[in-house]
A protein has these predicted regions:
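Active-site helix-to-loop segments that bind/position phosphate- or nucleotide-bearing substrates
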Residues: 1-31
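Extended, H/D-rich, highly charged conserved domains that either
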Residues: 35-36, 40, 44, 48-49
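Structural motif
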Residues: 43, 106-109, 111-115, 135-138
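Short internal beta-strands
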Residues: 46-48, 131-138
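Long, charge-dense
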Residues: 50-99
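A short acidic (Asp/Glu
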Residues: 56-60, 118-124, 143-147
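C-terminal accessory extensions appended to soluble enzyme cores
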Residues: 142-203
Length: 203
């Protein structure tokens, strides 16, 4: 799956293809991409319910699939088991585990909602080889904060109000602020990764 799945797209559809980083038009993606485009040190990976784990620069075409659970919508998963089946079919848990073990990275920044987080099977697959920041809800960080090399930061309505962002786009805004701070003052990310320093005091 992943890049292999992208490469398997029939040629007749490729004339409509766009880069994966430009395919998604949600607030989180828009907020984040403004800064990613300026930060050459970023290697953007996307967890896709259509392709698996892909590079931001992979060419893709649109699709109707999501990891969100809603039994009233045909493009959503109708249960947790269906969500898991889709994730496994796209080899997301194994692909994410492999990505986190890639020692060529200096650090990681994970901006996933709860449904997409679950698709990555975090509680059995996460053992990062590099320091990693994760923004999440109170529920999602409860167990992740126990994993070595993962620094969890709560992202909720209070933070959304502080940073003038919608709740669904907040993680993208926070990720963008980290990248902007690093571009303005190299070394800022090191402070963000420090377990003894609140990330919110840095950005």
């Amino acid at each position: 799956k992943g890049r292999k799945h992208v490469q398997a797209i029939p040629k007749q559809y490729m004339k409509e293809a766009v880069l994966a980083k430009d395919l998604y038009i949600g607030g989180q993606q828009i907020n984040l991409m403004k800064s990613v485009s300026q930060a050459s040190f970023v290697d953007l990976k996307i967890v896709s319910a259509g392709y698996g784990i892909i590079d931001g620069n992979d060419k893709t075409v649109g699709y109707d699939s999501t990891f969100k659970i809603d039994n009233k919508k045909p493009d959503c998963c109708h249960s947790k088991s269906e969500q898991t089946q889709l994730a496994n079919a796209l080899e997301i848990p194994s692909g994410f585990k492999k990505l986190l073990q890639d020692k060529s990275y200096d650090c990681g920044l994970i901006l996933l909602g709860d449904d997409y987080l679950n698709a990555c099977d975090p509680f059995t697959n996460w053992n990062p080889a590099f320091p990693t920041i994760f923004f999440g809800t109170k529920n999602s960080i409860k167990n992740l904060k126990l994993i070595p090399n993962v620094k969890c930061e709560l992202a909720n309505q209070t933070h959304a109000k502080k940073y003038s962002a919608g709740v669904t786009s907040l993680k993208g805004k926070l990720g963008a602020l980290i990248l902007e701070a690093e571009l303005e003052k190299p070394g800022t990310i090191d402070k963000c990764l420090d377990p003894n320093i609140s990330l919110y005091s840095v950005i």
